[in-house]
A protein has these predicted regions:
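Flexible loop and strand-edge segments within Gram-negative outer membrane beta-barrel domains
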Residues: 213, 233-285, 289, 304-331, ...
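Transmembrane beta-barrel wall of Gram-negative outer-membrane proteins
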Residues: 183-207, 213-247, 274-291
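Extracytoplasmic beta-strand/coil segments of soluble accessory domains associated
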Residues: 36-49, 73-115
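N-terminal periplasmic accessory domains that precede
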Residues: 46, 72-75, 95-98, 127, ...
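Transmembrane beta-strand segments of Gram-negative outer membrane beta-barrel proteins
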Residues: 53, 105, 135-136, 155, ...
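N-terminal periplasmic "start-of-domain" segments of outer-membrane beta-barrel proteins
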Residues: 13-67
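Short acidic/polar hinge/loop motifs at secondary-structure boundaries
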Residues: 114-141
């Protein structure tokens, strides 16, 4: 897919608004000359840190304009190639990532630095979040991830809300279409309706039949944002995201299918089960940055959801389970506070905490989760004039039934003008989710990272290694009836295990506008849940003519054989597979994006050779597919 040459740091600049050029002139009356100009919003509002995080991967809304994407996981896959995609083969389902040998439950998602999670499952459906709602996205790993977030020894993703600062009405429309009757649209309207005030409204609608039986979805959401900036140093926002997200949960294909490529004859494990969530996420956030050395920000939030699991009688779990439609209601209310202080030219301190009340009802698939939890952290960063930087921190969380501790330290040091060394060591706990069983002990993760960087990020080489040791890992097995129907999972604490691996990526400009990269991931140990080798190569050429541009390129990747773990939809847990997943390549993809004025057309012809590949066992990736999307912004 499309390449991003380094983490971008783009945002709505002051030049985007007519307020930036309003200046009093000599013949202006005194009353007008002394009038207060409208304030600009704090550009770092909603970020984990109001100041620079050196080891943070970041991309912004201007970056994703160049990408052929349909959902948030499409963007993450193109911007963070060190993650292994745990894709379910289509759109709208629980597509996630394995980072440094972890799994989807080791990743944490935040919006404006407040947590987004489904309490029953202990994780979040990434593609539930509309990409058009983001301004910038931070991806943290290692020490920074486990200190600033919970259950995040894989990665911590924080999404900053979109910042629109326009005097005239701003409108952006997005439309997408693909095979298997995929149709999607998105709209955004925003305007400064009074000095220092902005209102934003958006919607998103998607539908998809799916390649295989019971793998489609039907999704829509609406969103609203209100911003008040009384000064250039202070910003308050109120946002609401309502989601209605329904999808077929077929559990992957049956292992004994003779042909995994024929959507007519390939039989799914579960033919009569679908899930739908109705969810509200309301966030009141504030940021205050009085000077270049101090910042305070926080948020109060509410999230409520109703999960519906609609099942045929063949998937009832026992004689007491007689309702076809099972509903589980969850809610959590909380507050987050973060303080940052520059102690000296070389020392920064960050501290904060959160307080949360959660209530998630019990069901045939999940334990009850109810009560108050609290967390606090401290993070210090030190940078010398020689370019050496140190970061360390600790986080403690007290839940209803356990205490979790996370801590770590990291160093970055230049070896020469073109070579830099990084190392990171962290220790963290992951609490079990209600669907795993709250009576289980927490997992304990030890993660060591080491890397070398040669040259700049846009045209250099990155090589890194990791080692992850997991004590009391939470493992799951499939529960079936006498007919082989999947009824759910049973989780338990397994034997300690370790996984080691590496990642290497090289980027270069072959010519002035011809950009190429190759990359590879490697994994060993840990029960062979991940392939020994996963790698690829891609290239793109960009042509510019005034304000218009054309980008075209290709990408191809492949994996070696591995056993892996497959996904069980009733509990969102992974179980060991019966068979080995064969080595495969992704069939090669070609893509192009064209910009003409404020309109942008994107097209991807993926899997040209209709190759069969499974990133999650028994969930084949899409075959030859044409994806087209068009966006058009007015008064941008």
């Amino acid at each position: 897919m499309l390449l991003v040459a380094g983490g971008a740091d783009l945002y709505s600049a002051a030049s985007d608004t007519l307020y930036a050029v309003q200046k009093p002139v000599a013949d202006t009356p005194d009353s007008a000359r002394n009038a207060k100009l409208p304030s600009l919003p704090v550009k770092s509002h909603g970020l984990i840190s109001q100041f620079t995080m050196p080891e943070c991967v970041m991309f912004g809304k201007r970056d994703i304009e160049k990408m052929p994407y349909f959902e948030l996981t499409d963007i993450l896959r193109q911007t963070f190639p060190a993650a292994f995609p745990q894709s379910l083969g289509g759109f709208g389902g629980f597509n996630s990532f394995s980072v440094f040998g972890g799994n989807a439950h080791d990743n944490s998602l935040r919006f404006n630095a407040r947590p987004l999670v489904s309490p029953m499952f202990g994780t979040f459906l990434l593609d539930q979040f509309p990409p058009e709602m983001l301004e910038r996205t931070e991806i943290l790993t290692g020490t920074d991830a486990v200190v600033f977030g919970d259950n995040s020894s894989g990665m911590l993703i924080n999404i900053q809300e979109a910042i629109h600062d326009v005097k005239k009405p701003y409108t952006r429309l997005w439309y997408a279409q693909s095979d298997y009757n995929f149709i999607a649209s998105d709209g955004v309207f925003s305007q400064n309706f009074a000095p220092d005030w902005n209102g934003t409204f958006g919607f998103r609608r998607q539908s998809y039949d799916g390649r295989f039986n019971n793998s489609g979805f039907d999704i829509w959401n609406v969103r609203f944002g209100l911003r008040f900036s009384p000064s250039d140093k202070t910003t308050f926002t109120l946002t609401e995201l309502f989601t209605n997200h329904g999808f077929g949960a077929n559990g992957g294909l049956m292992p004994d299918n003779t042909d995994f490529t024929n959507p007519i004859t390939a039989l799914p494990r579960i033919s009569d089960l679908d899930e739908r969530v109705f969810r509200h996420d309301i966030t009141l956030a504030g940021s205050w940055r009085p000077d270049s050395g101090f910042a305070a920000n926080g948020s109060a939030y509410f999230s409520g959801e109703n999960w519906e699991i609609n099942r045929g009688s063949a998937y009832f779990t026992g004689v007491a389970d007689t309702l076809r439609l099972m509903q589980t209601r969850s809610a959590f209310v909380g507050a987050v506070l973060r303080l940052e202080q520059k102690i000296s030219d070389i020392l920064f301190l960050r501290a904060g905490g959160d307080l949360t009340w959660v209530n998630s009802a019990a069901s045939v698939y999940a334990d009850v989760l109810s009560g108050v939890s609290a967390a606090g952290y401290i993070h210090a960063s030190w940078a010398s004039s020689a370019g050496i930087s140190l970061r360390s921190g600790a986080r403690i969380r007290i839940d209803q039934d356990r205490t979790s501790l996370s801590l770590g330290a990291a160093v970055a040091a230049p070896i020469s003008s073109q070579i830099a060394f990084t190392a990171d060591f962290s220790r963290s706990d992951r609490a079990p989710s209600p669907t795993e069983g709250r009576n289980l002990p927490s997992e304990k993760h030890l993660l060591a990272l080491a890397g070398l960087r040669f040259g700049p990020d846009s045209s250099g080489i990155i090589a890194s290694m990791f080692s992850r040791y997991i004590s009391s890992p939470i493992e799951s097995i499939r529960i079936t009836d006498t007919n082989g129907n999947t009824l759910g999972t049973h989780s338990f604490s397994g034997d300690s295990r370790a996984v080691v691996g590496g990642f290497i990526r090289g980027r270069t400009f072959l010519f002035k506008r011809l950009f190429a990269q190759c990359w590879a991931q490697s994994y060993f140990g840990g029960g062979a849940e991940l392939p020994a080798l996963f790698g690829g190569i891609s290239a793109q050429y960009e042509y510019k003519a005034g304000a218009s541009s054309l980008i075209a390129g290709f990408s191809v990747s492949g994996i070696t054989a591995y056993r892996g773990e497959t996904f069980v939809p009733q509990t969102w847990n992974y179980v060991a597979t019966e068979n080995e997943t064969p080595a495969a390549f992704d069939g090669c993809s070609v893509f192009a994006t064209a910009k003409l004025g404020n309109a942008r057309l994107r097209a991807v012809y993926s899997n040209l050779f209709s190759a069969h590949i499974e990133y999650t066992p028994y969930y084949p990736d899409l075959d030859r597919t044409l994806r087209i999307s068009l966006s058009w912004a007015f008064n941008d």
